[in-house]
Amino acid sequence: MKYLPNLVVASLATLLLASCGNGDSTVSMEVRLTYNDAPYAVGETVYKGDTAVKFEKFYFYLSDLQIGDQLVEEVMFCNAEDSTTMNYEWSLENKANSFFFCVGVDSLNNAMDPTSFDVGHPLSSANDMYWSWATKYRFLRIDGRSNPSGTLGTDDILLAWHTGKDELYRCVDLTSQLAGAIKGGDHLILEFELDQFIQNMSLETESMTHAMADDYDIAVKLSNQLPGAFNLRVE
């Protein structure tokens, strides 16, 4: 019986350690389109100066998303009209002080055959983001229209920004936007700020690119806008 107190103490210590180790390690993230700091829904009309703009399709790839030293997602297909592709959850191994990702598909995955993936895979041909064996995946697929008169109508300027090719892969480091460590239980909001993305684009003369020779400079300009078009908030 003289060993009973020690046994009780040991049992309590074990329970205490177990309870301390059962904290929530889940981190969730929403990818959100915004325009002038307000959430943007595909099909909504917004304004760049006096020009009316409407995005009607908005698809893009994010790759190599790292929170701290942990690679949480190799590739993500984001369809702004499908919330299941804009919301994610991961189990975070440790607190993290950095956040990094790239826009597009890295060169290894860009060389893959899309028909080799299951329908639910981000790189599946079902997502209709693959051009051909020569040009490979589209990194961005943005379709819409604009009108400098301020009213959309029959004389709209069509917008088609389709970029791809390995050299247009762009990476984004948002570590400097973190006020503190990312930890289990946090909800991250990754904002794609469309007003920042299009601010240096001419909606009249730079409205079309398929990353081909005759419009490649527009694809490069769009791609170079990407690192400054994302914002990270932690809730």
Residue ranges and their predicted role:
Residues M1-V8:
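Bacterial N-terminal signal peptides that target proteins for export
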Residues V9-A13:
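Hydrophobic helical h-region of N-terminal Sec-dependent signal peptides
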Residues L17-S19:
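C-terminal motif of bacterial Sec signal peptides marking the signal peptidase cleavage site
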Residues G21-E235:
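A short, solvent-exposed, low-complexity linear motif enriched for acidic/polar residues
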